[in-house]
Amino acid sequence: MNPLRPADLHHLRAAEGWLELGNEAEARGELDQISTNRLDHPDVLEISWMLFAKEQNWNACVKAAELLVQQAPERPGGWIHRSFALHELKRTEEAFINLNPVRRIFSDQWVIPYNLACYLTQLGRIKEAARELHTALKIDPRAVKRAAVNDPDLEPLCKHIDELRSG
């Protein structure tokens, strides 16, 4: 993939900055100024996905992530983002099916087994979820513990673990 032209890169960085500041309207305005033929660039798709996620436009998130997977399958973000958006759309089985095959390709990414654990928990597959969470903990225990503390997707798994401890 060719690098972005300086003007497009400027708008992309500005959009990213506006997103970090919580100003989605300005971020959208910057993205709108990027050349039309560069909207499928992986870096643009990543920032577009972030904007759509802030807006909770999960259908647009799925589309952006699918394009990202097509344009840059070597990047874990597209795979992770697509499944996250599918899960937000209550298409959790599909989220799991799409993310599970790349877990070995991106074995250094704790968020993949973590998200798989969330999806499996929501699907009622608690034992498999526990294995995935254990895998995530081996990769980055601090990040996983921070993410898991208040994650409602893992509540059924936590209850199961508590029951095992007490009983």
Regions found by a protein language model. Name each.
Residues 42-43, 76-77, 110-113, 138-150:
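Boundary/linker segments of alpha-helical solenoid repeat arrays
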Residues 9, 13, 47, 81, ...:
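"A position-specific structural signal for the A-helix of alpha-solenoid helical repeats
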Residues 121-144:
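TPR/TPR-like (Sel1-like) alpha-helical repeat modules
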Residues 3, 37, 71, 104-106, ...:
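Structural marker of alpha-solenoid helical repeat scaffolds
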Residues 4-54:
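Alpha-helical segment of the N-proximal tetratricopeptide repeat
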Residues 20-21, 54, 88, 122, ...:
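Register position in tetratricopeptide repeats
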Residues 1, 140-167:
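Terminal, low-structured helical/coil segments at or just beyond the last alpha-helical repeat
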Residues 43-111:
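Alpha-helical adaptor scaffolds
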